[in-house]
Structures are given as C-alpha cells and as structure tokens.
Regions:
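A detector for small-residue-rich transmembrane helices and their helix-helix packing motifs
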Residues: 2-326
Length: 326
C-alpha cells in the first residue's frame, strides 16, 4: 500500500547479483562464440593441410538454391553465401500456391535485409522489437493487471525483478518512440565497436541500476514512490559509453553527425537538465534514472571496461584447459 515503507536492502542485493550475473553470462557466451570461431578456423586449416577440405556448406547452399521451386521464384542470378538465408528462401518458395509470387518475393527481400544486418544490428533491433511487443501487451485490457504486477516497478511492492522488466514498458507512444530512437542511435554505434553480448550486459545493467536509484529516491522522499517504467536509464548508460568512445576515437560513424567535441556537450546538457529536475524535485520524469545512467556509462567506459576483457579471456582460458584435458 502507499502508506507502507519502501525497503531498499533486497533491491540493492538483487541489482548487484543481476549485474554480476549478466556480465558473467554475457562474457561466457561471447567467449563461446570466439572459441567456436577459432575451432572452425583450426579445422579449416587442418583440412586444407591434409588436402581433404570440401566446402560442404557451399554445396548445401547450391543444392537448395538450385532446386526448381527456388529457381522459378528468384531466378538463376540470385546468389547468397548464407545457409540460413538459403533455407529461409526455400521455405518461402514452398509455401502454398494461393500466396502470390509477388508476396513471396517481398518476403524474400525482407529475409535478405535481415541477413544483411550485422550481429550487433540484429541485437539492437531485437531489443527494440521486444519493447514494441511489451508496449502492445500493455494495450490489451485484460492483460493490464498482469502487466502492472510484472512490468511496472512499484516501490511499495517489495519486488526487485521489476527493476529489469519495467525497462521494456513505456507509458505512451511518444515515450516509446523517443526511447527507441535513442536506443537505435546509441546501440548501433556501441555494437560497431563492442560485441553484442557486451552491449546487452551494459544496457541491462545500466537500466537496472538506474531504476534502483529511483527506488532509493522513493525511500528517501515518499512523494516519489510511484510506478516506474521506461528504457531511458539504459539508454543514458549507452549515451555515456558513446561519449567516452567519441572522446577517444573521434567520429565513430560517417553517417552520425556528432563529433568528439559535440557528443560530450550533448550529454552534459542533458545531465544538467536532470540535475535541475532533481534539485526542484520535479515529478513525472525519471531525472534520477537519467543522471545515474549517464554517470554509469561514462564511468564504466572510462575506468572499468577492462573488466569485460578479463572476463572473456578467463572463460576462453577455461575452454582451452578443457580441450587440453580432453
């Protein structure tokens, strides 16, 4: 109830455990992927050295793309080097005849666009899609009680996991649009220079800790003990990371107009406005979450990003030891 005290201890423990866990799991997955690449390269080199190398993947793709059904739809000029894309095209080509060829070709173009994305871009777009899906679920009247229980962080509830799930909820279409626009802009830049697993760990951790900061504010000032939602804490964390990367490397992307001089100014102006909102105790906007996310992003990218490399290397070393033991 609104008159109940807002407890903090469990939320702090949960946020610390989540941040540690998401970084360890993400680093482990990244190490698995890197080690898989190394194993494939090793096998390829060994096969070529023995003179037994065959491009089985290429042959599989040629068989799929050379089938009469696929050729009738895409023509002989269509080429792909991706097995997953070839399988998707084959599936589309074999859909029922009542689906027009134009519709099938449109679906194939969409598949081509998806496979043309980098792993980082797919990760960012997947995160945006998840936010849109959750926003849609909020619009289903019969789901409102469930969404309010599990996708809105309410300080009086005593729940901690909603500090994570509330990141994917948004109050209005405008709220969703601007947060997703910012997530797209910063996410694409970040995933250009760090693995997508690292991006996920940074984004989710910044969002959870930013929500924790709002939770602590509500414990100190009961007037702020209202429901929290939104991705802005995580987005501000990415903005902080991008600011440091800009300061180090200059322009990260030719298509992105900000420079190493203007990016820090943009973040400082945003954070200064958040400080004003906090000082005047304005409500309705998560100023504390914004400020916390920005500070976390800058601090992490400037001083603690080496922790990620150490985690990944430690997991890769375990892989190597396991291989030697076997």
């Amino acid at each position: 109830s609104d008159g109940a005290p807002v407890y903090v201890k469990w939320q702090v423990i949960w946020a610390a455990a989540f941040t540690t866990g998401v970084f360890c799991i993400s680093a482990g997955l990244c190490a698995d992927r890197y080690f898989g690449y190394l194993e494939r390269i090793k096998a390829l080199v060994e096969a070529r050295g023995l003179g037994v190398y065959t491009d089985s993947t290429g042959e599989h793709i040629n068989r799929i793309m050379g089938s009469a059904v696929v050729q009738a739809l895409v023509g002989p000029e269509f080429k792909t080097s991706k097995l997953g894309q070839a399988k998707a095209i084959n599936f589309i080509a074999r859909l029922p005849d009542w689906i027009s060829p134009e519709t099938k070709r449109g679906a194939i173009s969409l598949v081509g666009g998806l496979y043309g994305l980098s792993l980082g871009e797919r990760c960012v777009y997947s995160m945006i899609t998840l936010n849109i899906v959750v926003f849609g679920l909020w619009r289903v009247p019969r789901l409102l009680p469930t969404m309010a229980r599990h996708f809105l962080h309410q300080p009086h509830s005593g729940k901690a996991y909603t500090m994570l799930t509330s990141m994917f909820s948004h109050a209005t279409p405008v709220h969703l649009f601007f947060n997703m626009l910012s997530l797209w802009g910063t996410g694409i830049l970040v995933t250009d220079v760090v693995p997508e697993e690292h991006f996920i760990a940074m984004y989710l951790s910044a969002g959870v800790i930013s929500c924790l900061a709002m939770h602590i504010q509500s414990a100190l000032y009961p007037a702020f003990a209202i429901g929290y939602l939104g991705a802005s804490g995580g987005v501000y964390g990415l903005m902080g990371v991008v600011t440091v990367l800009y300061a180090r490397n200059g322009k990260l992307s030719e298509s992105f107009p900000l420079t190493s001089a203007t990016m820090p100014i943009l973040l400082l102006v945003s954070m200064a406005s958040d400080c004003v909102g906090i000082a005047f105790k304005w409500r309705g906007v998560g100023y504390v979450a914004h400020l916390t996310g920005g500070i976390l992003g800058v601090a992490y990218a400037e001083w603690y990003s080496g922790v990620w490399d150490k985690l990944v290397l430690s997991f890769m070393a375990r892989h190597a030891k396991k291989d030697v033991a076997e």
